[in-house]
Amino acid sequence: MAKCFITGKKKSFGNTRSHAMNASRRDWKANLQKVRILVDGKPKRVWVSARALKSGKVKRV
């Protein structure tokens, strides 16, 4: 998946552990939403994290 246009958030990697502590590789995806925002005065559709939207770092068009 893409990364956040504002914060640069992207998916992170690690292990999931079973009860027996066996490791399996997995990834955690950031909560990204595709929104239209103004970039250089023009509307553009970009991936933005939900946290950036909630905190008001982005103004939707």
UniProtKB/Swiss-Prot annotation:
<comment type="similarity">
    <text>Belongs to the bacterial ribosomal protein bL28 family.</text>
</comment>
<dbReference type="InterPro" id="IPR050096">
    <property type="entry name" value="Bacterial_rp_bL28"/>
</dbReference>
<dbReference type="GO" id="GO:0003735">
    <property type="term" value="F:structural constituent of ribosome"/>
</dbReference>
<dbReference type="GO" id="GO:0005840">
    <property type="term" value="C:ribosome"/>
</dbReference>
<dbReference type="InterPro" id="IPR026569">
    <property type="entry name" value="Ribosomal_bL28"/>
</dbReference>
<protein>
    <recommendedName>
        <fullName>Large ribosomal subunit protein bL28</fullName>
    </recommendedName>
</protein>
<keyword id="KW-0687">Ribonucleoprotein</keyword>
<dbReference type="Pfam" id="PF00830">
    <property type="entry name" value="Ribosomal_L28"/>
</dbReference>
<dbReference type="GO" id="GO:1990904">
    <property type="term" value="C:ribonucleoprotein complex"/>
</dbReference>
<dbReference type="InterPro" id="IPR001383">
    <property type="entry name" value="Ribosomal_bL28_bact-type"/>
</dbReference>
<dbReference type="GO" id="GO:0006412">
    <property type="term" value="P:translation"/>
</dbReference>
<dbReference type="InterPro" id="IPR037147">
    <property type="entry name" value="Ribosomal_bL28_sf"/>
</dbReference>
<keyword id="KW-0689">Ribosomal protein</keyword>
<dbReference type="InterPro" id="IPR034704">
    <property type="entry name" value="Ribosomal_bL28/bL31-like_sf"/>
</dbReference>
